[in-house]
Each structure stands twice: as structure tokens, then as C-alpha cells.
Amino acid sequence: MSNSQLQPESLAEYLAHLPMSDQQRAELAGCQSFSELHQRLSSSTFDGPTDAAQASVGQRLTLSTAAELEEAEMLAVDAEGRVCLKATPPIRRTKVVPEPWRTNILVRGWRRLTGRTNPPAPKKDERVLPAARWRTVGSIRRYILLVLMLGQTIVAGWYMKGIMPYQGWSFVDLEEVMHQPLMQTAQQVLPYALQTSILILFGILFCWVSAGFWTALMGFLELLTGHDKYRISGASAGNEPIPKDARTALVMPICNEDVPRVFAGLRATFESVAATGDLDRFDFFVLSDSNDSDICVAEQQAWLDVCREAKGFGKIFYRRRRRRVKRKSGNLDDFCRRWGGDYKYMVVLDADSVMSGECLTSLVRLMEATPDAGIIQTAPRASGMDTLYARMQQFATRVYGPLFTAGLHFWQLGESHYWGHNAIIRMQPFIEHCALAPLPGKGAFAGAILSHDFVEAALMRRAGWGVWIAYDLPGSYEELPPNLLDELKRDRRWCHGNLMNFRLFLVKGMHPVHRAVFLTGVMSYLSAPLWFFFLVLSTALLAVNTLMEPQYFLEPRQLYPLWPQWHPDKAIALFSTTIVLLFLPKLLSIILIWAKGAKEFGGKFKVTLSMLLEMLFSMLLAPVRMIFHTRFVLAAFLGWAATWNSPQRDDDSTPWSEAVKRHGPQTLLGFCWALLVIWLNPSFLWWLVPIVGSLMLSIPVSVISSRVGLGLKSRDESLFLIPEEYAPPQALLATDQYTHENRWHALNDGFVRAVVDPQQNALACALATSRHTQAEPIEWLRQERVRHALKVGPAALNNSERLALLSDPVALGRLHEQVWSEGHSEWLSAWRQSVDADPHAPLLPLQPLNAAPQPA
């Protein structure tokens, strides 16, 4: 129901939500209509009554931020004379053209045989650079790694073969087997077929474990001695002035994220860079792909707040894409196309990333000192979460992670990994060589590339540029999922992306190291179904040994019977060796902490106890992850879509109902598996207890480990303590403080606010990007959208309709004016409820930003 007569209480309510003095409100209180109010606010004319609110956008916007906006020259007008905010710098387009993928080696070979020309090989950048000895050293090191892995696997495989009970494959006459009854053939061949399959799977899995062991071992030696002549961080002295032309863009692609946390981390990073005195070399970009209308409005307000509070106008930019093409890689492509030519370097941040100013300026100096480096990846340190699960994962990555990152650097040198965030990229080669075309074909492994980081690193190396890990560079931080289920949601996306990337394994021109990176990416998830099938086949072999009568004679006139053999000594030796390979890296990590000082980890006793508890916890979770990852791999091959929702980044506990729903099938599998083994051979259950027991306990372990209270209690006891908790760096302190403040005045029901609230509407109109010139079809569409929104109210509008209104400043302004002038109760009631739901109680600061670090 609407009322065309202006009600005094409505006018007073409207004016009360504008930041002006009582005298200004008194002067405007005599307005006879909202059109007159907007005209007096704007001191200008407008096209008609329905465009009254559009005319006052500039004045409503500058009531609280006039000085800051004018100083930074942030206000402008579009071609139609409408006020807009310059939230992005001027566009200077750069050509970004992805190269089509040719993934089929058979097609390339056939074209070569038939005389048809294949497309030319990708050109490397022609640069005059001094010869790099690290390339030769890296190749030699990787050959050594390959020999160590294969040699270790061959020895272990030989032992495994000797453990197997049936040793008579050579006596099986395949020709005779084909002409005898099927049941007799099965009795003879099945045990040997199972053993062979088990042996093959064992070899693959042992080789995978061996690679991790040698990587951690070399990382331990690197960190213990501190002598690494090829580390990238040694290329710069660390205090050289940054050249004026070394402009760097910090880009943060986001999509439906936790807005208070995102802009808190951005502000902390911005202020840390400002403290170095080199802020004039950096610009900050928030590149939003959000499609939730409430979150979009909250992002706009958060951007304005952080610019005002941190004096970031003209340095912190915000853009929201309306066409979300190619997910994150498409978002970065779009940035490179519009503004990439203005910058020499680009630092990619994740939504939960925080980086110190010293780290960022060091990265720029390293790029300047290493002219053949295309990407330098930092080793982000996990921190900031309080659930028991997240704290154990933070401890694991902080204690064991440095060994593996240093080991990766030892084997790969300048042909290393890029993890998609907390890294600096040289813009020119990235634009020219790293744009990603969709994978050809149809199905689950075609289309836009999901895990873009490994592919971009491979393309950068293919073009002749180095990809380095600065594993010893401090000041780079990230956050981990708060619980097991949220981590597994992320793993499903990564699993699908890594399986897609393997299609590029044989693409022409890829460096062998990055072909191996694609392979290791696949094995990170394919190892789970391989391990699962290994256990299933082992159980099947147990069933064969128990239920089938052994065949002692496999050929006619065989003189001696083939007795099943058992070698418990070899089994124990092989089992012990495998345990050493799995757990020695963790022990080496603790030894390294003992050697360098364990105070920041809670002391020698507490860090050792934390390691033992984490080992037990990881053993409990390994079978659970195995089952989930097996499901993910099968889902990818069967074409089941993986949703690409943003991960949970706040401390979040798992409810029992959700745990039962997700882990119930695993629990049932664990009980059934255990009962089957007990029925076959109870003594074998002791070997399988770590697997089936973990599956049975998956529900309580998942729920209990997600509790914040247990995480805080463990921190009070100095368990799973990390240096970032013992003595938090300034950037993390600031992030916590700003997150706390942002949550206090966080915007809820953003879309309703953008329509009804005087200030939010002005901001949304000024940032709307659909700025069409006058045209009859567009005008008709605007009228229909406004009419429909007024008719059905905010609750009935779907998200697409909301986004269309947010993108059009004219339609949004008209809707705002008509809601107030006609008194639409549904819109006004929804807005009042949203305002009443705001948290009004002031919150005390967590701790002073400049306080001295205190031990936990």
C-alpha cells in the first residue's frame, strides 16, 4: 500500500539518516515532497520527478566524506551527467590473448605424418641474460632424486614380493588355464592376480611416500645448515631503493567472502606498506566476482570505509564484474586487460591473505635483482583460527611445512610451484604467455581451468622465465579452514582442478619439471583411491586364503608342491621402513626447532607433546580423507559437478547432524569392514584397526575437533602453539583489531539498505556500472524493473533481479525515490527491521595495535 502524500514523520525519518546538523535538517523539514527535498539537496535540476533521487546522489554521498573525496578527486560525472565515484583508475587496455590448447598428442603426430603443419611452438621471450648455473644444478639434483626414489621403491618392492604367500607365477601355464573349467582357473589364478595388483599399487604408493621423504630430508639439511647459495632471497641486500618505474599492483580477487575479514586484512596490509615509506610504488585492487546482492552492497560500503579510515582514496580500488567469466583466472585476465599495462609487477592475494610491508617491498626488490624471475612465491604461514582442528593444522603447517617448502626449492630451484596467492608476478610475460584458454572438448574435464596456478607457472617457465619459492621470506600469512568438512569441500574443488590440469601433461613446450608438477598434483588425490584399492585387495587376498583351498600343484607332473610362504621378519622390516618414511620428517622438524629454539612453540616438552598429539590426530583422519578423496576422484570421472563456493573462513563448529550426514556412510563402512575381517581371520584385524577404527570414530572426531572452546583451551596450555600466537606480528594484530571493528558495524541486508537508506543508496548509485545513454528499450526495461520491485517487495525479488537493479544507477535511484514518496510499507518495514538488527553495543578493542607482543 502506498501514499502519494508526503508524511512529516517520513521526511523526518529520512533526514535523520543523513549525516547533517540539526540546523540543516530544520531548513529541509519544510519540503512538500521528496522531489523538492532532492532538488534542494542537489541545488540542480533533473529530468523529471522519478529522477529526483539521482540528482542528489553527489550531495548525499559527500555529507560525511566531502573532504576526503574532494582531496582525492574521487567524484566525476558520466556522459549523461550522473554523479559517479572513481573507484577504479582510468582504463588503459592491453591485449590479452590466450593460446588455444592442443592436448591430443595423437592428433599432433598424425598431422606430422600426413605432412600437415602443426602450429608453431610457443616462442620464448628473447632476452639477453647471463648464463644461469642453477638450471644445470637443478637438473642434476632432480636426476639424483629420481634415482633415490626408484632405488628405494625397487628395494621395497622386492621385500614386498618376498612377503607374499604365493611365489609360483612361473608355474602357471596360461595355455592350459584357458582350456580348463572356469572355477578351477579362478582357484589357480586369483591369488596370483591379487598379489600382482597389490604389488603394483604398493610400488606406486611407496614411490609417492619416498618423494615426500627425500623432499623433507633435503629441506631439513637446508634449514639446519642455513647454507643455500641458490636461494632467491639472497639475490637482494634488502635495503635498495625501489625504482619509480617498479610499480606494483596488489590484487585481491574475491567472491562472496566474509566482508569484514577481507577488508580488515586489506587495511592491515595497506597500512603495513605505508609504514615502509614505499606506498607510492603500490596500488591495491579488490576484484569482486560476488553475485550475492547483500554481499555486493556490503563490499561497497567496506571499500568506502577502508579508504576513508586508512586514507586510501586513489590507492585502494574496487571493481565488481557483472560477467563472471572463467572464475578467478578470468578475473585476473580482466584486470590485466584493463590495467595490467600500468604496472611492472602484480602481487596476488587471497581473500584471507595478509602480507607485511617488509615482505612486499622485499619481493619487489628480489624481482628487480633477478631479471629472469617471472614468479616468486612466498611460503604463507597459517594463523588466525581458533578451532581445535584449525590450530592443529596451523601447528602442522608451521612445524613441518618449512621442511617441505625448503626441500621443494632444493630440488626445483627456479622451476618451482606457484600456489595462486601471496606471490609476486612479472606483468609483461604474464600477460603475454599466461592467459588461459578453456580446455577443448566436452565433459567434466573440459571448459574453464579450475586450478589455474600450476598452469600459469608452467606457461611462465615455458616462456623462459623462472618460478621461484622464497621459502625463508617472513611476513606472508593465510588462514586455514576451521573444520574437517570445510577443508574437504575445498579439497573437492582442488581435486577436480588437478585432474583437469593433467590433460596438459603432454602439451607441447612444457618443461619436464612442470609435467612432473601436474603429475604430483594428480597423485595428491589419486593416491587416496590407490590406497583404498590396496586395502580392499589385501582384504580380498585374506578372503581367498581363508575361504579357498590352496592349489599346491599348478602343472602336470609337478614334482614338489608350492607351499604358501610367510615371512613375518620381512613384513615387520618393511612396515618399519614405511613408518620411518612417513614420520621421520615430523621428528626432524622437532629436532630443528629444538636446535633453533622452541620457546615460541611453547618449549621443548610442549612442542614434542603437540607433535605426538598431532601425529595421532593425523592417523585418525587419514582414512577419513582417503574415503572422501576416493569419492571426489570418482565424482570427477563420472562428471558430477563440483560447486565453486567460497570456503568458510570464520571459526565454525560442525553440528552433529551435519557430521552424521557426511560421515555416516564411512562409519557404517568401518563397522562392516571390521566384522568381515573378524569373520575371515580375527588376528588380521590388528593390522586393520588403524583404518576401520578411524572410520568408526569419524563422526565424534569431526565434531569435537571443530570446537572453538577446545582450541582456546589447548592454546592456554601452550599446545599446538605457533610463533604467530606467541608473539603476533603487527600485521596480524591489526587484522584482528579491524575484523573486530568491522563486525561491529557490518552491513546486514545490504540490498534493502541500497534501495531505502539515503546514504547507502547514494553510494550504490555512484558505484553502479551500467551507465547507458538514453534509449527507448532501456528506458522501458528500467520502468518494468522498478514497477516489479515496488509491486512484489524485497522478499520476492530473486538475486538476478536485485543485481540488475544494483547495476543501474537510474533504476536504483527511481526505486529509492518512489519507495519514500509513495510510502511502500514492505520496503520501509524491511529497512527498519534491518536498522534495528544492527549491533549497537560498543565493543572494546581486542588489544592496542601498538602493544608489545605478549607470550600466550
From Swiss-Prot:
Q: Which GO terms describe its molecular function?
A: hexosyltransferase activity
Task: Please state which protein family the record places this protein in.
Answer: Belongs to the glycosyltransferase 2 family. OpgH subfamily.
An individual GO BP term = glucan biosynthetic process
User: Entry's InterPro entries?
Assistant: Glucans_biosynth_gluTrFase_H, Glyco_trans_2-like, Glycosyltr_2/OpgH_subfam, Nucleotide-diphossugar_trans
Please state what the protein is called.
Glucans biosynthesis glucosyltransferase H
Q: Where in the cell is it found?
A: Cell inner membrane
Per the record, the pathway is: Glycan metabolism; osmoregulated periplasmic glucan (OPG) biosynthesis
User: What UniProt keywords are attached to this protein's entry?
Assistant: Cell inner membrane, Cell membrane, Glycosyltransferase, Membrane, Transferase, Transmembrane, Transmembrane helix
How does this protein sit in the membrane? Answer: Multi-pass membrane protein
Q: Which EC number applies?
A: 2.4.1.-
Q: Name the SUPFAM superfamilies on file.
A: Nucleotide-diphospho-sugar transferases
Q: Where are the transmembrane segments?
A: 144-164, 198-218, 517-537, 574-594, 608-628, 684-704
According to the UniProt record, one GO cellular component term is: plasma membrane
Known role: Involved in the biosynthesis of osmoregulated periplasmic glucans (OPGs).
